[in-house]
């Protein structure tokens, strides 16, 4: 029997954290952060990390698990998220993954956990190679490899070819999770307004000081390449005015939100909800209750 879990996905600034906490309170859950930047200690404002008050409202996992000068990969996330899910379920609670890093979520949910002996850079390079092929070329590779998959589509073909190449046993690498993926969305202009407002609020909370500390101490770290920090470095070096740097930050965040939505729409099976709808979030809660009770209803 597969483990049921909830995923709250969507672009930045749509309220994923707030919904995740509400669902954790209603359904006896614990939250696993699915954000590539929130793993870093001392980076709180620019990563939009859950506040101490929010973390007190629901148990959070995979927040503050790396120092800012350490690297973090999709493989690290999958390995640690699997352990967190096992722990949460063992205590009779519901795992709720909250985040906007599409690669991390897809890697966990669709079985890209290929084992510690596999070079994840090789996996990603092979995935990039496959994505350059046409549908016909992909399906021909499936046929020539003798791989059997239940449903032929581009996403499943790429996944199957990866597993075939890097795993000794395709069946054993199948994901053991049954996710309900909640995608938060809204009118593009409203999302962009929320992003602009959020950046202004981050500045009020001390984003400049946080980014300056990172610039002074770890300017070459992986964590420093995240949106919210790198855009401010030209200001610190005197190459741009503060207004120019903040406008670039807002612009990059808006573009990132657009890429996030594209990823979730094209690469994952997501149930989308408009956050400005009068039915939200009750419609999410109702659908989730049905999903969680399906097993009992079948008995």
From Swiss-Prot:
A GO biological process of this protein is: tRNA modification
Annotated spans, Interaction with substrate tRNA: 35-38
The molecular function terms of the Gene Ontology recorded here are: ATP binding; tRNA dimethylallyltransferase activity
The record's top EC class is transferase
Q: Which reaction does it catalyse?
A: adenosine(37) in tRNA + dimethylallyl diphosphate = N(6)-dimethylallyladenosine(37) in tRNA + diphosphate
Positions marked as site (Interaction with substrate tRNA): 101, 127
User: Which InterPro entries is this protein grouped with?
Assistant: Dimethylallyltransferase (IPR039657), IPT (IPR018022), P-loop_NTPase (IPR027417)
- Positions bound to substrate: 12-17
What keywords tag this UniProt record? ATP-binding, Magnesium, Nucleotide-binding, Transferase, tRNA processing
UniProt-annotated binding residues for ATP = 10-17
- Enumerate the cofactors the protein uses: Mg(2+)
Instruction: Cite the EC number.
Output: 2.5.1.75
* Summary of subunit composition and partner proteins: Monomer.
Which family does the record assign?
Belongs to the IPP transferase family.
Show the NCBIfam families listed in the entry: miaA
Matches recorded under HAMAP family: IPP_trans (MF_00185)
What does the record give as the function of this protein?
Answer: Catalyzes the transfer of a dimethylallyl group onto the adenine at position 37 in tRNAs that read codons beginning with uridine, leading to the formation of N6-(dimethylallyl)adenosine (i(6)A).
What is the protein's given name?
tRNA dimethylallyltransferase
Q: Which organism is it from?
A: Streptococcus thermophilus (strain CNRZ 1066)
């Amino acid at each position: 029997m597969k483990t049921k879990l909830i995923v709250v996905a969507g672009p930045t600034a749509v309220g994923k954290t707030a919904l995740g906490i509400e669902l954790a309170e209603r359904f006896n859950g614990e939250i696993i952060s699915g954000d590539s930047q929130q793993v870093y200690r001392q980076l709180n404002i620019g990563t939009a990390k859950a506040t101490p008050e929010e973390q007190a409202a629901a148990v959070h996992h995979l927040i503050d698990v790396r120092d800012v000068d350490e690297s973090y990969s999709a493989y690290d996330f999958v390995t640690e998220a699997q352990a967190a899910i096992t722990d949460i379920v063992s205590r009779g609670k519901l795992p709720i993954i909250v985040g906007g890093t599409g690669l991390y979520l897809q890697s966990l949910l669709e079985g890209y956990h290929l084992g510690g002996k596999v070079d994840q850079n090789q996996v990603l390079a092979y995935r990039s190679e496959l994505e350059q092929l046409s549908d016909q070329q992909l399906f021909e590779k499936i046929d020539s490899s003798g791989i059997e998959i239940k449903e032929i589509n581009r996403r499943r073909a790429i996944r199957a070819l990866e597993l075939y190449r890097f795993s000794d046993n395709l069946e054993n690498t199948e994901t053991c999770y049954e996710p309900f993926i909640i995608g938060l969305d809204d009118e593009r202009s409203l999302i962009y307004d929320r992003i602009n407002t959020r950046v202004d609020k981050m500045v009020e909370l001390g984003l400049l000081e946080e980014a300056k500390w990172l610039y002074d101490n770890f300017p070459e770290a992986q964590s420093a390449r995240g949106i919210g920090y790198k855009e401010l470095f030209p200001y610190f070096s005197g190459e741009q005015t503060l207004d120019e740097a903040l406008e670039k930050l807002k612009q990059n965040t808006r573009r990132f939100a657009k890429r996030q939505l594209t990823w979730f729409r094209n690469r994952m099976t997501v149930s989308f909800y408009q956050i400005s709808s009068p039915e939200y979030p009750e419609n999410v809660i109702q659908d989730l209750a049905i999903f969680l009770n399906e097993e009992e209803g079948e008995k």
